[in-house]
Amino acid sequence: MAAPLTNNRTPRWVNGQRRKPVTRTTLLTRLSVLWGMGLAAGKLVMGLSVASVFLCLHAFYTACMGLARWLFVRVQTGGRPFGLWSARGCYPAMGGIVLSASVFYMLYSLRLFLGQPSPRYHRYVAIAIAVFTLAEIVLNIYGSVTARRRSEPLLHALRLTNLAASLICLPLAQAAILSFTHTVDLSFYNGLSGLIFGAFAAIIGAWMLFHRPKQPAE
C-alpha cells in the first residue's frame, strides 16, 4: 500500500491568520533592520566616545527608522505588532515614527542654527563617519528602488521611510566632512542643513501619518 502523500508546503493559515510569503523585499528589509540597529549602536558608541550629542542623536534616528522597518516586516509577514494587522494601521504608525524622530532632530538642529558649537571630530573619525553615512544613504536608496517595483501600500510606506532616513543622513555627512576641512565653526550651516532636511523628513512622516491607503484585496 502506498504511503500517504504529505504536504510539505508552508500552511497558508497559522493561528487563524493568513501566512504571507516572504518576498525578496521583505528579506532585504529584515537585513536592513539588522544593519540599521548595528549602525545605530556603532553611532552611539562613537558618539559617547567623542562626547558628540549630534552623533548620538543620529544613532537615535537610525534606531527609529529600524523600528519603522521592523513594523513593515512584521505586518508584511502576517504578524500583528502592537495590534497592527494591515497596511491601514501600519502605514500611519510608520509615519508617526518618522514624524516624531524628525521633529526631535529639528529641535536639536535649531540649537546649532542659533549658535551652539558644532561637534568637531578627529580627521580619521570624521572620515569613518562620512563613509558609513554615505553607505547608509546608498543602502536606503537601494531599498527605495527595490520597493518601487510594486505599488502595495506597505511598500510605499517603506519607500518613504527610506527616503526620510536618507535625508537625515546628509547633514551628518556634511558635518563630519566640514569638521576637518574647515577650521572655523560652521554651526549655522550645519543647523540650517539639519532644519531643511529634517523638515522634509517631517513632511514625509506627517503625510504618512494622515494618509489612509486603500486596503489591498486579499
Regions found by a protein language model. Name each.
Residues 2-72:
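N-terminal topogenic module of multi-pass integral membrane proteins
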Residues 42-56, 109-124, 177-188:
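Helix-coil boundary and interhelical linker segments in multi-pass alpha-helical membrane proteins
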Residues 61-69, 101-105, 123-142, 166, ...:
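Generic alpha-helical transmembrane segments
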Residues 79-100:
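Juxtamembrane helix-capping/reentrant segments at transmembrane boundaries
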Residues 102-110, 164-181:
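Hydrophobic alpha-helical transmembrane segments in multi-pass integral membrane proteins
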Residues 133-150, 170-177, 205-209:
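Alpha-helical transmembrane segments in multipass membrane proteins, preferentially the mid-helix core
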Residues 143-168, 217-218:
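Membrane-helix boundary/juxtamembrane motif in polytopic membrane proteins
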Residues 186-204:
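Small-residue-rich transmembrane alpha-helices that serve as helix-helix interface/gating elements
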